[in-house]
C-alpha cells in the first residue's frame, strides 16, 4: 500500500467543489486540488442519467484520508457523493512536495 493517494469526488455545482478545495487546502489536508468539466452517465433511482458534472481531484497522504472524507461529506451538495481514492506513486521530488505541503 502506498503512502500517497488521489482523492476524487464529483458534483453538478462547481462552487461546491471550489469551496471543498479551499477548506481542504487551508487546513493543509491536501497539497493540490484540480476541478475538471466532465460528462457522466450513471444509474440513479432506477434511471440511467446523463449529466454534466465537475470532477475534483486532490493529492494527499493516505493517513489524512479520513479528515479529507469528512470535510467532503460535510460540505457536499449530493445525497450520496462519490468519495474515492487511488494509491499513487511517482516522481520522488513531487511526492516529497506532497509531504511538505500537508499536515
Label each residue range with its predicted role.
Residues 1-103:
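Positively charged, small/polar-rich N-terminal and surface patches that mediate targeting and assembly
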